[in-house]
Swiss-Prot record:
This is Small ribosomal subunit protein uS2. The keyword Ribosomal protein applies. SMART domains: Rho_N. Residues 235-283 are annotated as: Disordered. Residues 255-283 have a biased composition (Basic and acidic residues). One of its GO terms (cellular component) is cytosolic small ribosomal subunit. One of its GO terms (molecular function) is structural constituent of ribosome. One of its GO terms (biological process) is translation. It comes from the Bacteria. The keyword Heme does not apply. The gene is rpsB. Keywords: Ribonucleoprotein, Ribosomal protein.
Length: 342
């Protein structure tokens, strides 16, 4: 029985590669075709290479070898950590520290410091220190735990290295090849397959694809150590399984003709709307009448013109404007009085 089905590979988007302009010609044997300037990986070759890598990793774990899972990309860090813990192996899910393999003695000293900080916190030593010093030690512990937490129990160099995207994990791959450690890797169409001993041509940018392939390789270690392989569960497909029991709940919605008379009873409420409009209309009419009454009052106040000489020039001009005298704005006061008195 195959370790992974073609349907799982297809649904997880394993076959999607990078843009054609970013490809590595060495990946040509693993490319099926290209669509819309994106390479499509041959899933038959992917399934074949997965079988080879699975068998090789199984043999290494069967002989008591340890595996270091490496994936510092955002798309891979979570899956790498979960599957490595499930398989009882080591992992690096954040930045790879240079010399983790080639200078393992120095790394071991940092790991010992991390363990000493754990012990000091557990036995109550930190409680006797000033708060400022405790805060500094706490920050140091968090930093060491972030980069070395996945390998804090690794006593010796691992016998295999599994990486997601050899381009991103270039330093880790170089250190492993320098020490003769076999490298298993998920290689996309923009990577160099020669850097990896056991290539898995697949999409290394999709979370679902990375999770599926990491799950498969972790199963090789679990099976070699006599563990039980868990069934693969895709979180994104889980909601579709929950939709099935909800189907019966839709039937009562179709059997609602009994409730239709209830809505008919509420019809008179809609008829009440014109009544509101009728009340608004008479309120608008008196407002117009009031405005018409104000107009004659203003004219009555302007009419008295007994002593025009006592008025100001501005007032005379307003009267001249109302009377329709031409060029009234250029006339002087005496001329305005004379024109208005005619």
């Amino acid at each position: 029985m195959a370790v992974v089905s073609m349907k799982q590979l297809l649904e997880s988007g394993v076959h999607f590669g990078h843009q054609t302009r970013r490809w590595n010609p060495k990946m040509a044997p693993y490319i099926f075709t290209s669509r819309k300037d994106i390479h499509i990986i041959d899933l038959k070759r992917t399934a074949l290479e997965i079988e080879k890598a699975y068998a090789a990793l199984y043999d290494i774990a069967k002989d008591g070898g340890t595996v270091l899972f490496v994936g510092t990309k955002k798309q891979a860090s979570e899956a790498i950590k979960e599957e490595a813990i499930r398989a009882g192996q080591f992992y690096v899910d954040h930045r790879w520290l240079g010399g983790t393999l080639t200078n393992f003695k120095t790394i071991r000293q940092r790991i010992k410091l991390l363990h000493s900080l754990y012990a000091a916190e557990a036995d109550g030593t930190w409680a006797k220190l000033p708060k400022k010093e405790v805060l500094g030690l706490s920050r140091q512990r968090i930093k060491l735990e972030r980069f070395l937490g996945g390998i804090k129990d690794m006593q010796r160099i691992p016998q295999a290295l599994f990486v997601v995207d050899p381009r991103t994990e270039e330093i880790a791959v170089k250190e492993a090849r320098k020490l003769g450690i076999p490298v298993f890797g998920i290689v996309d169409t923009n990577c160099d397959p020669d850097l990896v001993d056991y290539i898995i041509p697949a999409n290394d940018d999709a979370i679902r694809a990375v999770k599926l392939l990491t799950w498969v390789m972790a199963n090789a270690v679990v099976e070699a150590n006599g563990g039980v392989v868990e069934k693969y569960e895709d979180e994104e497909n889980a909601p579709f399984e929950q939709d099935e029991p909800r189907k019966p709940s839709q039937k009562p919605k179709q059997n609602r003709p009994e409730n239709k008379p209830r809505f008919d009873k509420q019809a008179p409420r809609a008829a009440a709307k014109p009544e509101v409009k009728a009340e608004v209309k008479p309120e608008v009419k008196p407002e117009v009448k009031v405005e018409a009454k104000v107009a004659p009052k203003v004219v009555a106040e302007v009419k008295p013109t007994e002593d025009l000489s006592t008025l100001k020039v501005a007032e005379l001009k307003e009267l001249a404007k109302a009377k329709g005298i031409e060029n009234y704005s250029k006339l002087r006061k005496a001329e305005l009085v004379e024109a208005l008195s005619k």
